[in-house]
Amino acid sequence: DVSNVKCLTFANADVAEFTVPAGAKITKHFIKDLGLPKGTTIGGMIRNGEGVLVTGDTLIQPGDHVVVFCLSMMIKKIEKFFN
């Protein structure tokens, strides 16, 4: 579920917040092994009401709220990781 998307007009980029559903592709591998599209950065997440810094060794879990920065043209590809 995309909770919120903001367009950074002058940067041709988007910031999106996703709520991670059970079974989402993004929950199956460490961040570093997901093969996220170039130009994508996971800026952080909220797990159980607490902010968490994300590293390549982070494993995202269902129910996490994840903030993603990406080029505007990549948002549809990113959404597939959260479905």
Question: Model segments located where?
Answer:
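Cytosolic Rossmann-like ligand/nucleotide-binding regulatory domains
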Residues: 17-83
